[in-house]
Amino acid sequence: MNIENNEHSFRPHPELGEHISFTKEQPIDIHDSLASLIETVAPLEIDLVLEGETGTGKDTLARKIHRLSGCSGRLIAVNCAAIPETLAESELFGVNNGAYTGAVQARAGYIEEANNGILFLDEIDSMPLSLQAKLLRVLENRGIERLGGTRFIPVNMRVIVATQKPLLTLVEQGTFRRDLYFRLNTLSIQLQPLRSQVEIIIPLFRHFIAKAATTMQCTPPEITQELCEYLLSYSWPGNIRELKTAAKRFTLGLPPLNVPRNAERQGPQLKEILRRIEKSLIHDCLVRHGHSIDEAAMELGMPLRTLYHRIKLLNVTTQRIIV
């Protein structure tokens, strides 16, 4: 199942309930609805797919799920793209003594180390088809055989995979196994790029500056209006990761972005930015008050008729969140 691009709503596994909707994913201060979703799914023994561009916080989200899961085992994070294909099988499944020349000592692989914990496979889209078939067998049998061995080793683990490319598209292209996709895809969460969440850019930038200043033991530099406009107009291809680096550069007294001022300025105009911020604030307020428009209007200090008008104009979802 997958996130639908309708206010970023999704229809989850039956045991999660009827319907949950949310408007954005915020890595530092997670949006109320996504936070509720994570708290719901974290304790459940279901596998997850995280889809999003580089730097959108997939690793951060996987670690948060592990912290909230209550499982006794570790989170074993594996970057599938960083392991040479010739070593991938031994790294994942482990080896027995004498399995190949130079294998003088038996050792467990990443899958075995994830027993009673979570195996996080980042960039799963780079895994060779031959290894995908073996991973599917592990998920079906919940156990492994080390390379060069015949003994079945039971493994009780949960799997979270992350990808920059939509897995269903890769299935259609023939580069990802359809059966593995359906086995993994109990629930899919799509993390939004920073350019579609302009309302969090400045708060996150300030947050990262404060952290950098604490580490460097210096006073956080002031953010000018001109810099704010520049940050909001930038397209952020590196997403949160690039924003964090920009904050560190700015704290050091360097230009925050190592690009010409006339480059990559493809972000939304100020009017659109303000519209998104207002929509986000109204949505968050509705969520806090269980979608009670009366209570939201009181908190916002806004006449009820005006709030109704803004909800309709901005197309703010008012559907009750059910978990």
Curated annotation (Swiss-Prot):
Instruction: Reply yes or no: does the keyword Cell division apply.
Output: no
Q: Which UniProt keywords apply?
A: Activator, ATP-binding, DNA-binding, Hypersensitive response elicitation, Nucleotide-binding, Transcription, Transcription regulation, Two-component regulatory system
Q: Which domain of life is it from?
A: Bacteria
Which Gene Ontology BP annotations are present?
A: phosphorelay signal transduction system; regulation of DNA-templated transcription; symbiont-mediated perturbation of host programmed cell death
Q: Which GO terms describe its molecular function?
A: ATP binding; ATP hydrolysis activity; sequence-specific DNA binding
Kindly indicate where the leader peptide sits in this chain: none
- SUPFAM superfamilies from the UniProt entry: Homeodomain-like, P-loop containing nucleoside triphosphate hydrolases
Binding of ATP occurs at 52-59, 123-132
* Record-annotated Sigma-54 factor interaction domain positions: 41-251
UniProt entry tagged with the keyword Lyase: no
Q: Which residues bind DNA?
A: 293-312
* Identification of the protein by name: Pathogenicity locus probable regulatory protein WtsA
